Amino acid sequence: ECCRYVDCRRGCTPCC
């Protein structure tokens, strides 16, 4: 599974 989501500039994006 992919790693959890991280807060980016706007919203969230998968760190994988």
Curated annotation (Swiss-Prot):
Expressed by the venom duct. Keywords: Disulfide bond, Pyrrolidone carboxylic acid, Secreted, Toxin. The modification Pyrrolidone carboxylic acid (Glu) is found at residue 1. Belongs to the conotoxin M superfamily. It comes from the Eukaryota. Disulfide bonds join 2-16, 3-12, 8-15. It is found in: Secreted. Its main location: secreted. The keyword Disulfide bond applies. This is Conotoxin ar3i. Has a sleep-inducing effect in mice when injected intraperitoneally. It comes from Conus araneosus (Cobweb cone). GO terms for molecular function: toxin activity. The cysteine framework is III (CC-C-C-CC). GO terms for cellular component: extracellular region.
